[in-house]
Amino acid sequence: MAHPTEHTFADVVEVEPGIRRLTLPLPTGPRHVHCYFLQGTDGWTLVDTGLGLTETPWPEILAQLDGPVTRIFITHMHPDHVGGAEPAAEATGAPVVQGRLDYEQCERVWGSPDWPERISEWFIRHGVPTDVARELIESGHVFADFVRFAWNPTLVEAGDELDGWRIEATPGHADGHLALRRGDVLVAGDTLLTPITPAIGLYPESRPDPLGDYLDTLERIAAAAPRIAYAGHGDPVEHPATRCAEIAAHHADRLARTESALGSEPRTGFDVSHDLFGSALPPIQRRFAVAEALSHLERLVVEGRAARHEDDRGVAYTARSSGGRAF
């Protein structure tokens, strides 16, 4: 079986009996994404598909399996997980299976020509200067050409069974994020990562408190106490409950830092992103930084530690204890 940190792109390697890992390249950090083949009663389930790159050698990949791929399961609608769904389906002849909420958001983002305009306006309302907002959107939407998601997939919900695996709701990194659990094994997508932590951001049409959702997800995983979690990037998480506690502590610290950035003067998500992540970020990283700052600001509002102010000019936040003045 392969060592956790060893991978060669497009090679299919066994990580434990009945589970094989496929690692595909990404043009930006973390430079790779892991997909998984799960052996079942009628063939293999492919979990996630990488980007929709024409150079992905699906015939060579599939030739390494001792049986057909009978379904393709998508953990979430981010480009590096759903982007290759259509090419993978064409190569295998297998149906694509995706969560209902996740597919709805996938269609609104990657299937909607007005999405760049909508998210640009949203960033501007959160304090991003107009010229910077355009730059952020252009940098992030470069992936759109490589997102070939499957229209009208088979829709599933948390609690459904998929060839012996239970579908688990794991929102946070994406609202509709799903994982697969069987016995003491969790195929986690981007819910649990090591040594990095999953990005938890607020975006247009997000659920109102994605960080709160994610903290609840961590509690549920820790309570279930799986032996191992196979992640979408990096090494397998060998002590998932411990890793859940570490990530929760990381966000508690970031919440404290976010709270300390607030006072009586209204500050936007763009402002606070500089306190949390510094000023020297390329546009695509600033996009994530603003979204991450906003998820923490909204969590502080839910916890009564910050106040949210919104009018026709935009959205800003103050410390709850300061009282604050109108934006």
For the regions a language model picked out, list residue spans one by one:
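C-terminal regulatory/interaction regions
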Residues: 1-6, 257-327
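Conserved beta-strand hairpin/beta-sheet module of binuclear metal-dependent hydrolase folds
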Residues: 9-67, 179-194
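Aromatic/hydrophobic pocket-lining residues that form the small-molecule binding cavity
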Residues: 58, 82, 214, 293
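Active-site HxH/HxHxD metal-binding segment of metal-dependent hydrolases
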Residues: 59-157
